[in-house]
Design a protein with these regions (language model features):
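Residue-level signal for secondary-structure boundary sites
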Residues: 29, 75-77, 113
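Short amphipathic alpha-helical segments
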Residues: 27-50, 85, 89-93
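Glycine-rich beta-strand-turn "strand-cap" elements at beta-sheet edges
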Residues: 1-15, 52-63, 89-121
């Protein structure tokens, strides 16, 4: 289930999972329902910091949803992904015959953080 570059098991510092989804407009409510089932499982995982789902403002957007999930470490994310309940939840989303969602997940590390009033060199 893990794609190349999609795992961060060796990373002991905070990571962010960003997953961009293309979902047909008529399937968006069903997609969000499935995603919430998965998010409930992630929320109880050790090392989970938080997540949010963003929806494109424009109906014309190719990437209709963006999920941003923060983890204490890549290792914590990797461990959470091994949970059989989580894997089953993902399979339900992927194998749902009424959903034609395409996901583009990747794990990232912050390299620059900016807050109000910060001056960057």
């Amino acid at each position: 289930m893990t794609a190349p570059g999609h795992t961060a098991a060796g990373v002991r510092t905070p990571v962010t999972l960003i997953n961009a989804f293309s979902v047909p407009m008529t399937q968006q409510d069903r997609f969000l329902s499935r995603w919430k089932d998965n998010a409930r499982l992630m929320a109880s995982a050790p090392g989970f910091v938080g997540a949010r789902m963003l929806r494109a403002v424009s109906d014309q957007a190719e990437l209709t949803f963006i999920n941003v999930a923060e983890w204490e470490s890549g290792a914590a994310l990797d461990q959470a992904r091994r949970n059989p309940e989580w894997l089953a939840s993902i399979q339900r989303l992927i194998n749902d015959p009424e959903l034609d969602a395409k996901a583009r997940p990747m794990v990232y590390q912050s390299v620059i953080d900016v807050t109000p009033g910060d001056e960057l060199p």
